[in-house]
């Protein structure tokens, strides 16, 4: 799964604080978040659990999708997560 554009949502816990990001290497980026190697929001608020991701063919499409999701209200984001991950299980294990 290296070098494939992706949009992802991290959560601090079930129905907790959310963070939306975009990357070209999902495994590497989530590992960085989990190990607090990314300074800022996710480190400060303990947002480390991968609860949603979608892969894209082109980075531009992933960036546009990230921008779109960041504009959504919280409930729409929760609905998106729960559509594919109703129990908010940690998806990290699926990747590695």
Language-model segment annotations:
Residues 72-73:
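A common structural junction motif
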Residues 1-39, 43-55, 60-67, 80, ...:
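GIY-YIG nuclease catalytic motif and its immediate N-terminal context
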């Amino acid at each position: 799964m290296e070098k494939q554009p992706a949009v992802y949502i991290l959560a601090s816990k079930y129905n907790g604080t959310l963070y939306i990001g975009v990357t070209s290497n999902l495994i590497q980026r989530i590992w960085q978040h989990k190990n607090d190697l990314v300074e800022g929001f996710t480190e400060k608020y303990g947002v480390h659990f991968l609860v949603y991701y979608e892969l894209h063919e082109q980075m531009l499409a992933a960036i546009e999708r990230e921008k779109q999701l960041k504009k959504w209200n919280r409930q729409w984001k929760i609905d998106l997560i729960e559509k594919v991950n109703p129990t908010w299980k940690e998806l990290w294990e699926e990747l590695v």
